[in-house]
Amino acid sequence: MGKRFIGALVMVSAVTLALGAGQYRLLAQQRAPQPAAAAPQRGAQPATATPQRGATAARPARIAGHPNFNGIWQALNSANWNLEAHSVTGLPSQFWQLGAIASIPAGKSVLKDGGTIPYKPEALKQRDENRAKWPDGDNEAKCYMLGIPRYTYHNIPFQISQGDVDIQMVYPFAAGNRFVHMRDKDHQTDPVDSWMGRSNGHWEGDDLVIVTTDLIADSRLDRAGNFHSNKLKVTERFRLIDSTHIQYEATLDDPETYTRPWTIAMPLYRLIDENAQAFEHKCVPFADMLLYHDLIGDKPKP
């Protein structure tokens, strides 16, 4: 069983590095002040501004009358480990050689009421079983797409591309892509469930509201075994606080799994360093042993 964790543990380290880099860029890096322009000489022609390499174009506050959500965004919390409040813990004792690398950071609940997920009794038993068997069954460990809302609070930053009408979100981990159907006034559904489901969006004032359905039941909400059925409906609300902060909320409604709808809430931070990018995370090679252990044997590839 220990060797089946190899792919997941490598991925945990990569995600931790990505989170640390994102925090450093967002919180520590400041732009250097620009020198004052020299006063023009009498009779001289007005100077023409020459774009410098790496210069950032002015960011419009609104696009087609709506707030500008364009940018690379990141949640800075431990929700991907566990949406509920959790103390510091670690992987099973057989991984003692990893030392503190195998520790899981503490975190507070991201539920809006600060409580716990309102599972039905049988669903709670399933959650506990999922937790005991982690990473088995976790789509993140298998390098599958994470689905909604997990991609939003995953440790790796994601990108929002907003046009006059259409909106797309790109998630580097497992090549996740999400097209938000802003033109669909009838809120159609997809004929087949999928990892990303179908996202229909609309504006409520300055809030971007996205309703996602048709999500596959095999997706997990975090690494703590929290889950949903294919009856889940996720209603997200993106509210731009200023040019670098989004207040994010997502309400999860799944009558097969939960006794009532419940809501998570957290801020998202825009990466402000010059030439910020969302780098592709090719995770498939790290999941080979976990997925195909029985076929390729116990010995990891060199």
Q: Which sequence ranges carry the predicted segments?
A:
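PEST-like low-complexity, intrinsically disordered acidic/proline/serine-rich tracts
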Residues: 2-302
